[in-house]
Amino acid sequence: MRNHYIQKKFLELFVGDSGIYVYDLKNRRPLSMMKNASNIAFQKNLYQFYSNPVTDLEIERWIKQIEDPGIELISKIIETETLPNMEGLQKLYVYFLLQSMRTPCECQTQLELAEKINAYDGRYDYRDGVVSRFFDDKFYAAELFELCNYYDVYLLKMDKPLFFVTDCFCASLTVPTKDKIIPLCGHLALYLVQKGNKNKKIDLTQKDKVQLITESDYLKLVCDFSCTVDRWVFACYNDIVKKFIPKWYDIMFGREGHE
């Protein structure tokens, strides 16, 4: 199944195999999430969404609903089949940015964040049960996950590297000066995280332990990985995508029929 998202009035909806997530783009924080979206009822409804046209009025009404977010509300939307049609919005994008499911940042400094990360022993299982499935023994899921979870703490303080790997699931590569995010596939992300973090504990005060890559390094990795990736993910920030990865642009936007 493809993953889709819509964006309207600073709100973003992510619909995928793992769940439904609502993200507040203006305040950069998640609003709500519903796990286990791969159940029979959801699958049945999802196919109906593709074929039923949705008017702007219906979209506006739905957006107003999720401004008061909650898991119960998202569940109700699924049950009543009021989720808007993705194609009807002409916003059919493959999207796998899991920031939507994360909790707001509680750390105020890099040091506090490092201490919070180092407090885990690597066996911590996130409350939604999604971390452990993505890692084997050589990865410390909780540390990496929390590092991604609180990226706002240090991302805005970084001005030198063009790209910074912050997401161990889908490689959210960011251009700090423009505050843009480019999500890529999970396999590439794991490769970058593994390469950049050799030690068990991650200390954000020691930036040499966190993988930083230049534009040319990034493009080379993209080329090397392009033949092995089994799930495509791409950014909605067209200007960044077109500038740095033009070859991927058509593929990632589905123009070559890649599933």
What is the predicted function of each stretch?
Residues M1-R2, I6-E259:
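Alpha-helical structural context detector biased toward long hydrophobic helices
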